[in-house]
Amino acid sequence: MANVTVIGSQWGDEGKGKIVDWLASRADAVVRFQGGHNAGHTLVVGEQVYKLSLLPSGIVTGTLSIIGNGVVLDPWALRDEITKLRGQGVEINADNFAIADNCALILPFHRDLDALRETAAGAGKIGTTGRGIGPAYEDKVGRRAIRVCDLAHLDHLEPQLDRLTAHHDALRAGFGEPPIDRDKLVADLREIADYVLEYAQPVWKRLKKVRKAGARILFEGAQGVLLDIDHGTYPFVTSSNTVSGTAASGSGLGPGAVGFVLGIAKAYTTRVGSGPFPTELEDETGQRLGERGHEFGTVTGRKRRCGWFDAVLVRQSCAVSGVTGIALTKLDVLDGFDTIRICTGYRLRGKILDYFPAHAADQAAVEPIYEEMDGWHESTAGARSYADLPAQAIKYIQRVQELIETPIALVSTSPEREDTILIRDPFSD
């Protein structure tokens, strides 16, 4: 049986939630492998709308859902999200949900530090969600983190607290903040420990068993390749690797488990927060894309920046992440445009580039080279086969496929799960 890894091929917010939900109904396990509760997914199932930030999308369908070791976990955010979903009738228990016991925790002072840094940065801020993701990853890499398994040993936490407070109290002092209240922190952890430990286990072992049984595993990425700590628009990136290879290291399975890599890309481009955006439209066209696409962040509610499809960026994302096929989403947002543009290259100080440069100053300076196509005025909303699409919409899909040098495997034409045109089944490979 084939496994499938779903990743964002742009700056996140590509519609991964709908695609993962669609695939999860055919998977035996769904795994989150990086990020934290900074990655919002909106799922629409019938009349019910589910907003997830931390839990794998498979939880809504009752599929075994796993938070892998590559995720940083806010235990209080976890409890809030589970409580909300249970209120919507979703069943969550230790049989269908598991957390890696070696996950690093996001703690209250991580959120504090995130907010303090963003405020101090002023106009130079990164645009984080302020949820402590970056500082938690810093502590993980710095070997200071408190992990899920430590919640079962809170009476022996002193050495870790010494390392944590020595680091963070110095940072807090620089911002004029008081030291961490160790007693309160331990009390808060005692209060939440049993709740988290109910789901904690060596998930690599459970996944090994699932894989050995020939079951289908769906790896659910968060954010997008252009926010990858190495391959993204550094420093305007997230704090983890978002490329497909992280599915292996972030879950406890080897690289052979990654399977079919399905990249998700909107039929246009959006970005939330700061950072370079070559095709950004700050005119009526950009506003129209945002309004038609309802472009507001699931987690922050921030308005997303909008622009034309950038084939250079998506082609690069596909290359560095080994994308097997693309799911093109929100095609219906382009309905009604007389002319549609696609970025096919860049100009940078008199030179033509067919790739996105690494240096921040170069990224900010590139000018898009556009190819124009006729648009279409018929509706694509709800289309479920190529026969339902206008001829120009099909030409657009084909041209995108040529430019990104990667096959289009799926086309999504609305937030509804069934409104999907399947060209190549990821699970059949």
From Swiss-Prot:
A Gene Ontology molecular function term for this protein is: GTP binding
Q: Does the keyword ATP-binding apply?
A: no
Q: What class of enzyme is it?
A: ligase
Write down the required cofactor(s). Mg(2+)
Positions that bind GTP: 12-18, 40-42, 304, 330-332, 412-414
- Residue positions annotated to bind Mg(2+) are 13, 40
Looking up CDD domains in the UniProt record yields: AdSS (cd03108)
Q: Entry's SMART domains?
A: Adenylsucc_synt
Chain sites annotated for binding IMP: 13-16, 38-41, 129, 143, 223, 238, 302
Q: Which InterPro entries match?
A: Adenylosuccin_syn_GTP-bd, Adenylosuccin_syn_Lys_AS, Adenylosuccinate_synth_dom1, Adenylosuccinate_synth_dom2, Adenylosuccinate_synth_dom3, Adenylosuccinate_synthetase, P-loop_NTPase
Give the keywords, sorted.
Cytoplasm, GTP-binding, Ligase, Magnesium, Metal-binding, Nucleotide-binding, Purine biosynthesis
- What does the similarity note say? Belongs to the adenylosuccinate synthetase family.
Role played = Plays an important role in the de novo pathway of purine nucleotide biosynthesis. Catalyzes the first committed step in the biosynthesis of AMP from IMP.
Share what the entry says about its subunit structure, partners included. Homodimer.
Q: What is this protein called?
A: Adenylosuccinate synthetase
**What lineage is this protein's organism placed in?**
Bacteria, Pseudomonadati, Pseudomonadota, Alphaproteobacteria, Sphingomonadales
Name of the gene: purA
